[in-house]
UniProtKB/Swiss-Prot annotation:
It comes from Pseudomonas fluorescens (strain SBW25). Catalyzes the rearrangement of 1-deoxy-D-xylulose 5-phosphate (DXP) to produce the thiazole phosphate moiety of thiamine. Sulfur is provided by the thiocarboxylate moiety of the carrier protein ThiS. In vitro, sulfur can be provided by H(2)S. Keywords: Cytoplasm, Schiff base, Thiamine biosynthesis, Transferase. The lineage of its organism: Bacteria, Pseudomonadati, Pseudomonadota, Gammaproteobacteria, Pseudomonadales. HAMAP family: ThiG (MF_00443). GO terms for cellular component: cytoplasm. Homotetramer. Forms heterodimers with either ThiH or ThiS. The keyword Translocase does not apply. Pathway: Cofactor biosynthesis; thiamine diphosphate biosynthesis. It catalyses: [ThiS sulfur-carrier protein]-C-terminal-Gly-aminoethanethioate + 2-iminoacetate + 1-deoxy-D-xylulose 5-phosphate = [ThiS sulfur-carrier protein]-C-terminal Gly-Gly + 2-[(2R,5Z)-2-carboxy-4-methylthiazol-5(2H)-ylidene]ethyl phosphate + 2 H2O + H(+). GO terms for molecular function: thiazole synthase activity. InterPro entries: Aldolase_TIM (IPR013785), Thiazole_synthase_ThiG (IPR033983), ThiG (IPR008867). This is Thiazole synthase.
Amino acid sequence: MSIVRSDKPFVLAGRTYQSRLLVGTGKYRDMEETRLAIEASGAEIVTFAVRRTNLGQIEGEPNLLEVLSPDRYTFLPNTAGCYDAIEAVRTCRLARELLDGHNLVKLEVLADQKTLFPNVIETLKAAETLVKEGFDVMVYTSDDPIIARQLAEIGCIAVMPLAGLIGSGLGICNPYNLQIILEEAKIPVLVDAGVGTASDATIAMELGCDAVLMNSAIAHAQQPIMMAEAMNHAIVAGRLAYLAGRMPKKLYASASSPLDGLIK
């Protein structure tokens, strides 16, 4: 049975975005390369680690707010580097203070430094506290559909399952779990972590993900600005392919041209 998919706007915390690509600000050579790559990506949402980024609180060091304008981009402060719920909640409160009441945050609570897997127990605790405090929580999580469901029930505005380990570039390691999450989801689902090149981003979008967040895939490319542009196109292509619906796979060949009326 064929499924006709209609395009739905990408909405987060009541705001509609045209780009379905979210990008990070870390790992670039300098602030100028950061600025140029983000411009080339077409992204409207930019994430940064609160604990590692100068937003004006450190005098004499490069200030992200002087490179990327809050009038042009939506900032998504994240809790990278946090290993328990208390630390993550404290970091989100700091972000709110530094950004004058900004409520949109990306929650990530890590389990260990080797894998950077999410600690889902601490993530659930932190999410519950942050939602109660009025934060709009986008949450980095495992590809476990049950955990994704619980985070949505708590009140998170988006779930962000990893496709592969952070910074690994391994691509979409478990598309089947992502499919289950997508089938059940009542909030946006964004792939977070694992993307290594444009085809990975396209696959994520073809699965039906609402968006993709990446940093290393662009920043660690040999030519980051060119890769940022490639990712922009990949996201659009993947979304269109998802909406169009791919042809069914067949074991045997099927001729493209009709066989009747052949010239003899």
